[in-house]
């Protein structure tokens, strides 16, 4: 008897705080996912980093042996300055001197990466004025970009997602949930094909040092707004039509970001995902719901009474003959 009572009380406790338990498991799962990613990245990339460090030490030692007139301190000062300039997007290589980082097309590409919060980091402002303007420009531009993307995605979603699903549901009688799932999968497949696979194939041809995997990696890192900056198109030494290429990449990033948001919005509108998300949300209190219901009822009652009073006044204004006739009947006997 006591065991059954204890079990039922535990079940009621779990059901009462189900949202809190789900949220706790969500936080724990997210932290474990972070740790899992750190372990995998460290185990995969650390050996390659060690090999690269050993190779650089050998090259440095060989260079110093071949140039005995140069001290190690002088070489390190030179390399430090070169690396510092490289971090700002400036290269000392002779065949890279013709590529400017702040011509109009490069600045347009930089502005698009700032507003979309991609931020490759290969080109950064050098002057104090440029850094100050970048802060002000981002503070205004990022919310403006979010507003712009929200409006564009909302309009596209109506024509691309909601109307097709409603059409197949009404015209052919298919289940709305099934149609929504099939439509979301097809839309995701088309988006991945048009903005990942096809551009990756194009980049692998236009960029000399990129293979298909590296090109696909760039597309994903860019359209997911991660923007690591290890792969940036249009930075080749002998890049043809560089200005036109930069403008095309800017348009691709903007259209691809819109397409990604449309797909995400389409999946978020699925009934199953809505139910899944509600598991982690805080439920409204019953008292709060009752207050909202009472306020709604009061507003409805007051609006009804106001409408009734207005209708009575309109009837009085629209019936002048009735009023004059009744007054004549009252005054008539008195005059006689």
Swiss-Prot record:
Tissue specificity: Detected in bronchial epithelial cells. Detected in heart left atrium and left ventricle. Detected in cardiac myocytes (at protein level). Widely expressed with high levels in heart, brain and kidney, and lower levels in colon, ovary, placenta, lung and liver. Highly expressed in cerebellum, and detected at lower levels in amygdala, caudate nucleus, brain cortex, hippocampus, putamen, substantia nigra, thalamus, dorsal root ganglion, spinal cord, pituitary, heart, kidney, lung, placenta, pancreas, stomach, small intestine, uterus and prostate.
Stretches for region Selectivity filter 1: 117-122
Pfam families reported for this sequence: Ion_trans_2
Superkingdom in the source lineage: Eukaryota
Record text on activity regulation: Inhibited by Ba(2+) ions and quinidine. Inhibited by quinine. Is slightly inhibited by 10 mM tetraethylammonium (TEA), and only marginally inhibited by 4-aminopyridine, charybdotoxin and dendrotoxin. Lowering the extracellular pH to below 6.5 transiently activates the channel, and then inhibits channel activity. Inhibited when the intracellular pH is decreased down to pH 6.0, but this may be due to indirect effects.
Ranges for region Important for intracellular retention in recycling endosomes: 293-299
Keyword Mitochondrion (UniProt): no
Family of the protein in this entry: Belongs to the two pore domain potassium channel (TC 1.A.1.8) family.
GO biological process: cellular response to acidic pH; chloride transmembrane transport; glutamate secretion; potassium ion transmembrane transport; potassium ion transport; regulation of resting membrane potential; response to nicotine; sodium ion transmembrane transport
Phenotype for residue 274 to E: Converts the electrically silent channel that is present at the cell membrane to an active channel. No effect on retention in recycling endosomes
Cytoplasmic side, ranges: 1-20, 157-181, 268-336
Principal subcellular localization: membrane
Protein name: Potassium channel subfamily K member 1
Quaternary state and interactors: Homodimer; disulfide-linked. Heterodimer with KCNK2; disulfide-linked. In astrocytes, forms mostly heterodimeric potassium channels with KCNK2, with only a minor proportion of functional channels containing homodimeric KCNK1. Interacts with KCNK3 and KCNK9, forming functional heterodimeric channels. Interacts with GNG4. Identified in a complex with PSD and ARF6; interacts only with PSD that is bound to ARF6. Interacts with UBE2I.
Keywords per UniProt: Cell membrane, Cell projection, Cytoplasmic vesicle, Disulfide bond, Endosome, Glycoprotein, Ion channel, Ion transport, Isopeptide bond, Membrane, Phosphoprotein, Potassium, Potassium channel, Potassium transport, Synapse, Transmembrane, Transmembrane helix, Transport, Ubl conjugation
């Amino acid at each position: 008897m006591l065991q059954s009572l204890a079990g039922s009380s535990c079940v009621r406790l779990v059901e009462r705080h189900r949202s809190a338990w789900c949220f706790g498991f969500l936080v724990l799962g997210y932290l474990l996912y972070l740790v899992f990613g750190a372990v995998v990245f460290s185990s995969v990339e650390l050996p390659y980093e060690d090999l690269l460090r050993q190779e650089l030490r050998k090259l440095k030692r060989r260079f110093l042996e071949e140039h005995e007139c140069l001290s190690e301190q002088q070489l390190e000062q030179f390399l430090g300055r070169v690396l510092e300039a490289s971090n700002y997007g400036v290269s000392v290589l002779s065949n890279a001197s013709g590529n400017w980082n702040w011509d109009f097309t490069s600045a347009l590409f930089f502005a698009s990466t700032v507003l979309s919060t991609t931020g490759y980091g290969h080109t950064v402002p050098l002057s104090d004025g440029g850094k100050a303007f970048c802060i002000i420009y981002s503070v205004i531009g990022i919310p403006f970009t979010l507003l712009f993307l929200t409006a564009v995605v909302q309009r596209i979603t109506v024509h691309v997602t909601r109307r097709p699903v409603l059409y197949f549901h009404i015209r052919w009688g298919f289940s709305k949930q099934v149609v929504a799932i099939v439509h979301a999968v097809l839309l995701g497949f088309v988006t991945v094909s048009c903005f990942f696979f096809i551009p990756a194939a194009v980049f692998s041809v236009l960029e000399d040092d990129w293979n298909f995997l590296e090109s696909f990696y760039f597309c994903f890192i860019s359209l997911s707004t991660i923007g690591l900056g290890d792969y940036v198109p249009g930075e080749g030494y002998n890049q043809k039509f560089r200005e036109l290429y930069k403008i095309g990449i800017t348009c691709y990033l903007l259209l691809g970001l819109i397409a990604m948001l449309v797909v995400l919005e389409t999946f978020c509108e699925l009934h199953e995902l809505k139910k899944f998300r509600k598991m982690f949300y805080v439920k409204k209190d019953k008292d709060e719901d009752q207050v909202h219901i009472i306020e709604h009822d009061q507003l409805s009652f007051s609006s009804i009474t106001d409408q009734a009073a207005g209708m009575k006044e309109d009837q009085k204004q629209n019936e002048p003959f009735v009023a004059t006739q009744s007054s004549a009947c009252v005054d008539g006997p008195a005059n006689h």
